[in-house]
Amino acid sequence: MLEIGDLHVSYGQVEAVRGVSLDLQPGQIISVIGPNGAGKTTLLAAAMGLLPCRGTLRFEGEDLQGLDVEARVERGLCLVPEKRELFGELTVLDNLQLGAFAKRLRGDAMKKRLQSVYDRFPRLAERRSQRADTLSGGERQMLAVGRALMSAPRLLMLDEPSLGLAPLIVRDILAIVRKLREDGVSILLVEQNARAALESSDHGYVLETGEIALSGASAELASDSRVQATYLGGGTHDDD
């Protein structure tokens, strides 16, 4: 479904992602874990078309290189960014409607898509007229995911969805991620909370200083002594 091969991404003279290869099959949840500054956010930004890159980047067999962000959304990719990037002065409803912009939904089609999001996140329905900046952290993350779902993605990329959230809220958000997979949405999950990421995914990659250090089935990575020593001693939520 998503094929990333020998990907390189640079900021000026600094190469932030170096030769990364990753394969995501339909119906999978793939996690990418690693320390702050490892290049996780950069990897997602390149996949979404927000940063130029070199290497292979294909979605459902189509070369993504040269396609802008809107074109990638139209093809079924969507990114929930690390800081959620909501429009705080706008209502929950306004933010959700903006998520459907690339699909150009109108009338009944818009109402149907909104209802599908409200069915998944009843709290957003209750707060549809509230400004986004009045929501709690967990509600803002729900809104960020709901806005992404307005474009009906087949592949949803999530950047640090647990950032700044209490453990119980993290559990709820990751339960939503697993339910999305059951409903046919494939997931690329970037997390610094390695334990939560590996518990929620099928396959994992460990990214360190811009390179893949380890990869394998998530359960196997969780049992790896190197992963346990470095990443499972205690979760942190620093920005990437």
Indicate residue ranges for each PLM-predicted region:
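Glycine-rich phosphate-binding loops of nucleotide-dependent enzymes
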Residues: 1-240
